[in-house]
Amino acid sequence: MLCLRWCNPFLGQAGWLICFWHTFYYLLHHENMIRKIIYGVYAILGMMTMAACSGQSDASEISLEKMHGFPTENTGFLKGVSALYAGVIEGNLLIAGGCNFPDIPVADGGKKAYYRDIYIAPLSNDTAFEWKKIGQLPQAAAYGVTISTEKGLICVGGTTATHSLSDVFLLSLQKDTLKRETLPSLPVTMDNMAGALVGHSLYIVGGNVNGIPSSAMYMLDLSDLSGGWKRETDIPGEPRVQPVCVAQDGKLYVWGGFAPAVEGHQASLSVDGYMYSPETKEWS
């Protein structure tokens, strides 16, 4: 069981420094030199995360626990999948699609398999999930973006075994029945991107655009779908495949990402981050 708990989010900056030094002191006296360095970095990152979370004054306890149970209908799926569409809908955890190498590992030349099934599991205080298949994606796909909204989960783009996607649709539950509503398609195909919701505006950033690593950003106003997707200001720096994106206080934040080598451009790894203001349409 993996379990990480801290019970007082009000320690403040000094409190987190004390926690950090206690953790680092323990590592120095109980691990060999290589592990000291590695765990020391983990400790710093962990305490930074705790400090960031400490501003949530409505939380008295934060916990991370290992959950058990996985859909069993597909034997290949049982080996674990990555890059699936996922989110919480009507008190249920929903997962859809995804991919893996079910037979031969990628290092040995295995072929990647993509999945189509959609499963839900009720959220409870138990650490075991009870999954139920409730539908299928239009096609087996992975590496898209899933955004939780009041109406359901919006699935954007992604890729199949043969091609990238521009499809956008809303998944919702109505009397335990899965419904799928088509939304305006992206003007390009996109996969391995990130996204977040700022107010009624859905932003999709980075990834592969028409098969090429990109720093582009697109926005869809969910309160006016007739306007379709609009191109917004590109993220500064190099193209960003698989970046991290989050919305906070009316702003959009993007970190990291990479870009493989393509004709005319060397491979790159982005270790910086930027904040986007929808009001000024500028990054800083």
Segments from the language model and where they lie:
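Residue-identity detector for glycine
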Residues: 12-15, 40, 46
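Short, low-complexity segments with poor structural confidence in diverse proteins
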Residues: 25-26, 42, 188
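Kelch-like beta-propeller repeat domains
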Residues: 57-284
